[in-house]
């Protein structure tokens, strides 16, 4: 399969990349690292860092507000930093229990709420998802006030130790939350009253990352068990599983991307061609649709819809084994699947260590890895043409 040749390398970190995010308009990339830094890259202009935000511990997560004015970052010592992006200044620092680890931060699409996933590093402890008003978080405080964490408007607690929360995101117009768990389960919770709307177990090990496409009604999850799962958001049922060939691979990150179909409006070779437009139509028999998607011609590979959905994932074997195996055995390549029929469309090796985070904006894919670099790729149609 063709590699992606248009790769831009962003170098500036001294330790592994933990999380990367695009700005809302896609013109900038933010990368968080174990070197206690968050770097902003104006990658479209050059490959140099434009600004560095500094923590006092390893930075785990980044979240950019929808209006692109505020950034929330969380670290491994239970601290959250709120930044003014326009003025590149720190608004305030919130300190939770130092035994807590900030696992995820999410801001609602209307910029009203922020949810923070917190978990202790010890095994015999539960985890929390706290919800705050953004107006409260962005309100400047004195140094003394900043030492006391603000009171959350809502708190959701894991019910058992085995179901510790990993990541939380808003869904259904901010009326509910999707929360991934360490036991491989995924649950949807009513944001108002905390009642569980749906719950299902899709993996045999911890869900390391998940992404949601509201327009297409799907959820994509990646796990330590090496599988990538595609889930129907409406029914909360499994649509299909993708299993990379490398059995040692942890799938650390996943994203959903939608691109134009290169075969749209081409003459149809087979009458059994499935369209991405009706893949998740609940009135259709999903098994019939999936079975007709395996026709060998290119039209059936991509469907005849105007757009196709890509399921992108990456990871690699545990970093402690990286020095004992070669780059190919480590499973550090980035995989691009057709979400319609599960076919692997592209696989390319770019990093020299496990990939920890993926982000996508339009046709630009960014990856951050243990090798302390961020790599930016252009998703072009020629990528999917086999030689």
Model region roles, listed by residue range:
Residues 10-17, 53-59, 95-102, 158-165, ...:
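WD40/WD-repeat beta-propeller blade N-cap
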Residues 356-387:
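Blade-level signature of beta-propeller repeat domains, shared across WD40, Kelch, NHL, RCC1
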Residues 32-35, 74-77, 117-121, 125-126, ...:
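Conserved strand-to-loop turn within each blade of WD40 beta-propeller repeats
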């Amino acid at each position: 399969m063709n590699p992606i040749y248009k790769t831009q390398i962003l170098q500036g970190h001294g330790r592994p990349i933990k999380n990367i995010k695009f700005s809302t308009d896609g013109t900038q990339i933010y990368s968080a690292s174990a070197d206690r830094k968050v770097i902003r890259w104006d990658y479209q202009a050059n490959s140099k860092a434009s600004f560095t935000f500094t923590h006092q511990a390893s930075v785990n997560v980044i979240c950019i507000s929808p209006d692109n004015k505020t950034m929330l970052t969380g670290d491994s010592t239970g601290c959250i930093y709120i930044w003014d992006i326009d003025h590149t200044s720190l608004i305030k620092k919130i300190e939770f229990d130092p035994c807590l680890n900030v696992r995820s931060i999410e801001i609602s699409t209307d910029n009203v709420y922020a949810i923070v996933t917190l978990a202790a590093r010890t095994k015999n402890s539960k985890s929390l998802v706290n919800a705050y008003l953004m107006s409260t978080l962005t309100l400047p405080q004195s140094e003394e006030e900043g030492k006391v964490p603000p009171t959350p408007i809502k708190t959701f607690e894991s019910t058992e130790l085995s179901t510790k929360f990993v990541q939380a995101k808003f869904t259904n117009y901010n009326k509910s939350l999707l929360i991934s768990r360490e036991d491989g389960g995924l649950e949807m919770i009513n944001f108002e009253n905390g009642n569980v709307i749906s719950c299902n177990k899709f993996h045999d090990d911890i869900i390391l990352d998940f992404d949601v496409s509201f327009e297409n009604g799907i959820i994509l999850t990646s796990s330590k068990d090496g599988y990538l799962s595609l889930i129907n958001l409406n029914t909360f049922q499994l649509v299909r599983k993708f299993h990379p060939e490398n059995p040692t691979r942890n799938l650390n990150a996943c994203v959903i991307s939608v691109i134009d179909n290169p075969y749209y409006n081409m003459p149809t070779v087979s009458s059994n061609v499935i369209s991405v437009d009706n893949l998740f139509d609940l009135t259709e028999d999903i098994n019939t649709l999936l079975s007709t998607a395996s026709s060998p011609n290119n039209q059936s590979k991509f469907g005849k819809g105007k757009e196709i959905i890509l399921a992108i994932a990456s990871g690699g074997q545990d970093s402690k084994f990286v020095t004992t195996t070669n780059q190919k055995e480590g499973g550090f390549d980035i995989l691009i699947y057709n979400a319609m029929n599960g076919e692997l469309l592209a696989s390319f090796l770019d990093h020299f260590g496990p990939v920890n985070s993926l982000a996508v904006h339009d046709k630009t894919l960014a990856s951050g890895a243990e090798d302390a670099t961020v790599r930016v790729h252009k998703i072009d149609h020629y990528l999917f043409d086999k030689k």
